[in-house]
UniProtKB/Swiss-Prot annotation:
Changing residue 337 to A: Abolishes E3 ubiquitin ligase activity and proteasomal degradation of host proteins. Changing residue 219 to A: Does not affect autoinhibition in absence of substrate. Its main location: secreted. Residues 253-545 form the NEL domain. Autoubiquitinated (in vitro). Ubiquitinated in the presence of host E1 ubiquitin-activating enzyme, E2 ubiquitin-conjugating enzyme and ubiquitin. It is found in: Secreted; Host cytoplasm; Host nucleus. GO terms for biological process: proteasome-mediated ubiquitin-dependent protein catabolic process; protein autoubiquitination; protein K27-linked ubiquitination; protein K48-linked ubiquitination; symbiont-mediated suppression of host defenses; symbiont-mediated suppression of host inflammatory response; symbiont-mediated suppression of host innate immune response; symbiont-mediated suppression of host NF-kappaB cascade. It comes from Shigella flexneri. This is E3 ubiquitin-protein ligase ipaH9.8. Residues 1-242 are annotated as: Interaction with target proteins. Disruption phenotype: In murine lung infection model, mutants cause severe inflammatory responses, with increased pro-inflammatory cytokine production levels. Colonization is greatly reduced. Changing residue 216 to D: Slightly reduced autoinhibition in absence of substrate. Changing residue 166 to A: Strongly reduced ability to ubiquitinate host GBP1. Signal peptide: none annotated.
């Protein structure tokens, strides 16, 4: 390898004169470009990297995060990877024909040059592109999300992954599959697409198309649902949402959104309190969430719903930690349909109860804590069931599936945190048989797994630390003694039995398993002891609802 001086002020000897002569045109153009730097640009660093790349004949050139407003016209001809992301570029020069990977995300590009014929990866998300040039047949992956693109050129047959979220696309491209074995995943979420072309059915059933948050026509959704529900359907899996993607991005002040849930005689005091939280993270989206929550079927039809929300908001105003958690949970809820808001409300109520349990609300009411734990366990199992159901559907809005199991089983499984109504159950794909099977599975797993689950539940541990400090300390001492005396040998025995001694990944996995088994044994014993003391009149309460 040729010796390199970082500032590339080449010594005057015959060896370096030869190099300098070979690259004279490049060096001269780059030096001139460097002298034209605008304030804040790191063109000196860019030129250093350019010269190093050229002299070393490197196939990668990385000029990202240098605040560059332009690039020199003559890039090294041999490069296969160019990274110029996170700059201030408004255009790109002619690209080397050898280029296979182009990274130019988070710039200000309004157009792209002709793309090299061997290009395999194009990453130009977060720019100002309005259209794309012809795409080379070699292209495998492309990310054009967060641009202003209205239509797409023909997609190469080789393209496996396309991300075109948050553009202005009004239609999907034509899909031609034939016998092509490529497994594709294409994302067109949050565009302006109203119709789905029949050519989408040409894709294989291993492919996935994401079209959530688009204004799909009233005819497109039921037609696709009928088609994809057919036993003969062998097309791609299509992810959609009941949202039209047109949510209002204007948020009224947080205090105004909060006070709307309270009686008029309380609004002045509430407004004064909540004004102090206007600038907390996610405050704007939380405001929008509250407004959308007021328009759900539960808010319109459920008696006492407004009072329930007001009481919850009072608790948030008194706890910065709970408020921070709740703002974060609600952050994305305004970007989807009404049922997404309802599901978020379920999650917010769970967050409140778990927070209260951890903070001591149930320290003197073990029976109530058990009931809460049982509900959290049931919801966890329902999420597993919903996740499995999603995998079986070809045309699916995941939010509707998750909410359907919670809403439709809320009464039978005594789910106090679940809304009792949802708007779009009909598109969830969840059948009456699914619900019967889910209820039976929850009860079976609860009978067999709840005791162990509860003994490891964080809020229960918080209660034990506060109210059974001596017993908790003894359990922790027992755990650390095991770690010191038994843990290494148990891990070694497990690795030996599986023939994986010396495998670092297997050792980590075996260690985690041994630790969990140990904690399960110790905390289960502690749990049984404490519950026997606190609930002597109902020793079976842990095992039955």
């Amino acid at each position: 390898m040729l010796p390199i001086n970082n500032n590339f002020s080449l010594p005057q000897n015959s060896f370096y004169n030869t190099i300098s002569g070979t690259y004279a045109d490049y060096f001269s153009a780059w030096d001139k470009w460097e002298k034209q730097a605008l304030p804040g640009e790191e063109r000196d660093e860019a030129v250093s990297r350019l010269k190093e790349c050229l002299i070393n004949n490197s196939d990668e050139l990385r000029l990202d995060r240098l605040n560059l407003s332009s690039l020199p016209d003559n890039l090294p001809a041999q490069i296969t990877l160019l990274n110029v992301s996170y700059n201030q570029l408004t255009n790109l020069p002619e690209l080397p024909v050898t280029l296979k990977k182009l990274y130019s995300a988070s710039n200000k590009l309004s157009e792209l040059p002709v793309l090299p014929p061997a290009l395999e990866s194009l990453q130009v998300q977060h720019n100002e592109l309005e259209n794309l040039p012809a795409l080379p047949d070699s292209l495998l992956t492309m990310n054009i999300s967060y641009n202003e693109i209205v239509s797409l050129p023909s997609l190469p047959q080789a393209l496996k992954n396309l991300r075109a979220t948050r553009n202005f696309l009004t239609e999907l491209p034509a899909f031609s599959e034939g016998n092509n074995p490529v497994v594709r995943e294409y994302f067109f979420d949050r565009n302006q697409i109203s119709h789905i072309p029949e050519s989408i059915l040409n894709l294989r059933n291993e492919c996935s198309i994401h079209i959530s948050d688009n204004p799909l026509s009233s005819h497109a959704l039921p037609a696709l649902q009928r088609l994809t529900s057919s036993p003969d359907y062998h097309g791609p899996r299509i992810y959609f949402s009941m949202s039209d993607g047109q949510q209002n991005t204007l948020h009224r002040p947080l205090a105004d959104a909060v006070t709307a849930w309270f009686p008029e005689n309380k609004q002045s005091d509430v407004s004064q309190i909540w004004h102090a939280f206007e600038h907390e993270e996610h405050a704007n989206t939380f405001s929008a969430f509250l407004d959308r929550l007021s328009d759900t079927v539960s808010a319109r039809n459920t008696s006492g719903f407004r009072e329930q929300v007001a009481a919850w908001l009072e608790k948030l105003s008194a706890s910065a930690e709970l408020r921070q958690q709740s703002f974060a949970v609600a952050a994305d809820a305004t970007e989807s349909c009404e049922d997404r808001v309802a599901l978020t409300w379920n999650n917010l109520r769970k967050t409140l109860l778990v927070h209260q349990a951890s903070e001591g609300l149930f320290d003197n009411d073990t029976g109530a804590l058990l009931s809460l734990g049982r509900e959290m366990f049931r919801l966890e199992i329902l999420e597993d069931i919903a996740r499995d159901k999603v995998r079986t559907l070809h045309f699916v809005d995941e939010i509707e599936v998750y909410l359907a199991f919670q809403t439709m089983l809320a009464e039978k499984l005594q789910l106090s945190t679940a809304v009792k109504e949802m708007r779009f159950y009909g598109v969830s794909g969840v059948t009456a048989n699914d619900l019967r099977t889910a209820e039976a599975m929850v009860r079976s797993r609860e009978e067999n797994e709840f005791t162990d689950w509860f003994s490891l539940w964080g809020p229960w541990h918080a209660v034990l630390k506060r109210t059974e400090a001596d017993r908790w300390a003894q359990a922790e001492e027992q755990k650390y003694e095991m770690l010191e005396n038994e843990y290494p040998q148990r891990v070694a025995d497990r690795l030996k039995a599986s023939g994986l001694s010396g495998d670092a990944d297997a050792e980590r996995e075996a260690g985690a398993q041994v630790m969990r088994e140990t904690e399960q044994q110790i905390y289960r014993q502690l749990t049984d002891e404490v519950l026997a003391l606190r609930l002597p009149e109902n020793g079976s309460q842990l095992h039955h609802s």
